[in-house]
Curated annotation (Swiss-Prot):
Name of the encoding gene: GAL13
Known role: Has bactericidal activity. Potent activity against E.coli, L.monocytogenes, S.typhimurium and S.pyogenes but mot against S.aureus. Has bactericidal activity.
Name under which the protein is recorded: Gallinacin-13
Record GO cellular component, one term: extracellular space
One protein family per Pfam: Defensin_beta
Amino acid sequence: MRILQLLFAIVVILLLQDAPARGFSDSQLCRNNHGHCRRLCFHMESWAGSCMNGRLRCCRFSTKQPFSNPKHSVLHTAEQDPSPSLGGT
């Protein structure tokens, strides 16, 4: 009888050990890649995957500026400006 109890305990322990056999969870992988699990990413973050089995997003700080406008950041000269000139030719 004691052997059956011991075998039952071993089987239960083995059944509960399947999570580490699958590898890291997606939340742990997100943290390892310098990300944060959030419901929505902030405007300076990019979506880099999922967390909590797809319920949350893995957000990482992006190096790109998401709201930059190239027209206002670069000065255009008359040669680069594609708009027609108002002066006569």
